[in-house]
Every structure is written in structure tokens, then in C-alpha cells.
UniProtKB/Swiss-Prot annotation:
Protein name in UniProt: Ethanolamine ammonia-lyase small subunit
Gene name tied to this protein: eutC
Cofactor, how bound (note): Binds between the large and small subunits.
Obligatory cofactor(s): adenosylcob(III)alamin
Keywords: Bacterial microcompartment, Cobalamin, Cobalt, Lyase
Gene source species: Rhodopseudomonas palustris (strain BisA53)
Location, primary (coarse class): other
Reaction(s) the record says it catalyses: ethanolamine = acetaldehyde + NH4(+)
Nucleotide-binding recorded as keyword: no
């Protein structure tokens, strides 16, 4: 899980390692035409990502194929404009969805997975099922009982707290499309909360972000998410009280494997 640190001697070396805007150059008092056109294109891609459609039924099928029991819900949002201007509604289940989950009852296991559209539905369709598949293998090896998965339309991160509480889960993991950036319009994020309940703050969650081809790979993301879930359940806490030392553990394991004898 560890990668060698690349050697950087110039801005050209740095530009090969990141899609960020580095060393653009200039043309008179402005940037070169190509840099301006690239910026305009990336801005358009980010806007398109926010307004992309979400196919909950297709995602439900992918998750069901992984052996999960899947429930579809929606927030109180009633359209994409509503979602953007009323983030509070994206944190609350609509009454019908709430009643349906409450009717399921019973313990939700150690973990409930919530997969929501967020601000980049395309990222969810491109990567969520692959991350979940890799994550399930790690959770099974760790003896962690995974409850049902919930596919949420019009979701903000905190919607997972209400879902986790209704299903009686010890912990909730929310996989959601992140706010598109100019270099990453399809990035997935994971938010992990121990003892979920409505009213929690961001300080009580752990986040694994930038899951996309130029950021964290699906394997790396599953490793980090699995480590945080395991430690959160063992220590009975999450958020600022839980430091992500997953890479330290990976480095230690790598050294042990490479040691002679």
C-alpha cells in the first residue's frame, strides 16, 4: 500500500504528477489560450457533474450482485435545484422512506452502508460498487457484520446518521459523490460515523476523500476505509478522536514482509 516518493526537479516534473494547474505560463498579462480553454472546459465538466442524473435502480442491482440486501430511499429534496439551495433537506429522510426503514427494525449489524448521489452522481456510478466490493472482502476477513445497504437519492452526508440510527447499526459508512473540482469532476468520498444519530457534526466523522483515477485508487480507498471501520468499532469512537494511521500499519507490514528470514 506504500508508494515510492517521486523525485521532483522542476515544474515540468510536478505537472506530470498532478492534474492541478501548475506552471501555466503566461501570454501578456493573462494565461495562454490553451490554459484558458482548458479551464473553461473543466468548469463546464464540473457543472455537468453536479446536474447529472442518478440511477438508483442500476446501483441497487450492482450492490445486490455483491450479496447485499439493498433498500432505496430518498431525502426530502424534490429536485436538483432544491438539493443545491436547501442542503438541510438533503440531511433528512422523506416521511415514506423513514417509515419504511423504521419498519425493518432489528439490529443493523456492525455496519450499514449508505450510497448517495451527492454532488457528483457520476462518481458514484463509476466507483461506488467497485469500492464496496473490495471493502466487503476486508470487512469479512475482520469479522465485521455488515447489515443492509441503502441507496439514497438527494443525499447529503448527514443523511447517513438518520439511516444508521433507524436500522440500529453500530456504525454507518456513507459513500457519496464529492463536490466536483476543476481537475476532478467525478470524485467519490467516504464518511464514517460511529454510533450514528441525527444531530452529529462533521467533527464526529472520519473522511476518506479523492477516490478517483488521479487520486486514491479503489484498492487504496477500501484499505483505508476498512482500517478506519475496524478501529472505530474496536475503540467505540470516530471523528477527530480517531487518527488515520492506516498507512503506518501498511508500511510496517511491508517492512515485515521484506525482512530476511
Amino acid at each position: 500500500m506504500t508508494k515510492p516518493t517521486p523525485t521532483i526537479h522542476s515544474l515540468r516534473d510536478l505537472r506530470r504528477l498532478t492534474p492541478a494547474r501548475v506552471g501555466l505560463g503566461r501570454s501578456g498579462a493573462s494565461v495562454p489560450t490553451k490554459a484558458l480553454l482548458d479551464f473553461t472546459l473543466d468548469h463546464a465538466r464540473a457543472r455537468d457533474a453536479v446536474h447529472a442524473s442518478f440511477d438508483g435502480a442500476a446501483l441497487t442491482g450492482e450492490l445486490s450482485a455483491l450479496g447485499l440486501a439493498v433498500h432505496e430511499v430518498r431525502s426530502r429534496v424534490r429536485g436538483r435545484h432544491d438539493y443545491l439551495v436547501r442542503p438541510d433537506l438533503g440531511r433528512q429522510l422523506d416521511p415514506e422512506s423513514r417509515d419504511r426503514l423504521a419498519g425493518i427494525g432489528g439490529p443493523g449489524g456492525d455496519l450499514v452502508l449508505v450510497i448517495g448521489d451527492g454532488l457528483s452522481p457520476g462518481a458514484v456510478h463509476a466507483r461506488a460498487a467497485a469500492v464496496v466490493g473490495r471493502l466487503l472482502k476486508r470487512l469479512t476477513e475482520a469479522g465485521i457484520a455488515v447489515g443492509p445497504a441503502v441507496v439514497a437519492n438527494g443525499a447529503r452526508v448527514a443523511l447517513g446518521d438518520e439511516i444508521g440510527a433507524l436500522l440500529g447499526a453500530r456504525m454507518v459508512a456513507v459513500l457519496i459523490g464529492e463536490r466536483p473540482g476543476l481537475s476532478s469532476p467525478a470524485s467519490l468520498g467516504a464518511y464514517l460515523t460511529y454510533a450514528p444519530r441525527p444531530g452529529l457534526t462533521d467533527a464526529e466523522r472520519n473522511c476518506v476523500s479523492n477516490i478517483h483515477p488521479a487520486g486514491l485508487s479503489e484498492d487504496e480507498a477500501a484499505f483505508k476505509i476498512g482500517w478506519l471501520i475496524r478501529e472505530a468499532l474496536a475503540r467505540r469512537l470516530s471523528g477527530v478522536a480517531l487518527k488515520d494511521d492506516s498507512m503506518l500499519e501498511a508500511a510496517t507490514a511491508a517492512r515485515e514482509l521484506s525482512a530476511p528470514g
